[in-house]
Amino acid sequence: MASKTQKKNKIRQDIIEAASMYEQYLAGQAFLYVYGNEYFEVMFPVNRFLHLAGVETRLFAKKFYKNAREKTLTTQQFYFSPRHPFEVSKKKLSCLKRLYELTNTKVRILRNMETASVVYKVGISNLEFTLCLTENRDSNGEKINEYFLPMSLRAGRNSTKNGDDYGEVVL
């Protein structure tokens, strides 16, 4: 069985690998999703990477991403909590490394995805994981533009439950 230090080092390595993939395929880019007569655009800002990684840190989101991208992130710069437990982070990171797949393969579009705390207007899923999206709004709740932004990453087979709580599958 791996020690606590070994597990944390593995998570660090996964964060670094995920940051590399995010930088290569997603960071700063917008993607257009068209289904039926509808469409939406998703933007992948670097400050959203931290939340998708599922760990806690005292660093600002952009600094966390920069450290991960430059491979200078240390195991002392992130930690786990009841809100962001180790096992969930481990699952999220395996999906975060593959997040770009939602931009170049067939996906399911979900509308009005409801979780315990939030209703997401749109979600994108490959049936292994789901990216929950939110409108791009400022701190006053005013819409900034038409882009949707990554807000949450749901990992595992239950990422698109067949039920009303996960909204309407439209594609």
Question: How would you describe each model-predicted region?
Answer:
Residues M1-V118:
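An acidic, glycine-rich, mixed-charge low-complexity segment common to nucleic-acid enzymes
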Residues K91-L171:
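Conserved binding-pocket/active-site segment within a compact domain
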